[in-house]
Amino acid sequence: MPITDQTILSEIQRLTIEGVGDGGATWPSGMWTQVEVLGYLTQVQNRFLSETGVRWTRLETALTLLQTNQAAPADWMTTIFIAFKDAAGLYSELPKLDAQELDYIQSSWPGATAARPRGYYETDGDTLTTYVVPAPTAAASALERYYVALGTAFTAAGVNFSVPDEYVPTIKYGCLAEMFGKIGPAQNLVLAEMCEERWTEGLEIAKLQAPSSWFVM
């Protein structure tokens, strides 16, 4: 049975002496709010997914012809692998490149076109954009993307975790590290450090599992 946010929020409430646990609805001490804790939990889960790559998503997106910048999926966080698919359904890997590599491969790449791209690159500026070079001209072509997607945002309404069940405690301790590390009356750096250690342990174990990751179709 999947673990929900209400279950973990109740555990967090009991650990922080915020009552017996009501699924994260109330925080009597006033040191944290429901919105704040839900934000911590969601952010920590996304960080875990991005850093470990234990859960991949596969998605095919049609290429916009004669254009280098291709829109990435709205839930994209990190690219794992991209392949070019032609009209005949044949796939070929697109290597990840940077601007210097592209300069060596084809000095005119910023405005060049070709039936199929030779690679892709991503920049920090446009996080939901994948650049393919040269700009593709082949009709009915597409990108086959394998990427790490954002986890489901928590709402305290019984949302399932987006990580395998065995790593839910890791997310819990990551959330607690954020809660105890905040500036203000709730700050307890000793507890924050202890929770951070538990978080780090789970994170490193998950990285070992990443090569045997599974897909969300």
Where do the PLM segments sit?
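Glycine-enriched, solvent-exposed interface loops adjoining structured elements
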Residues: M1-M217
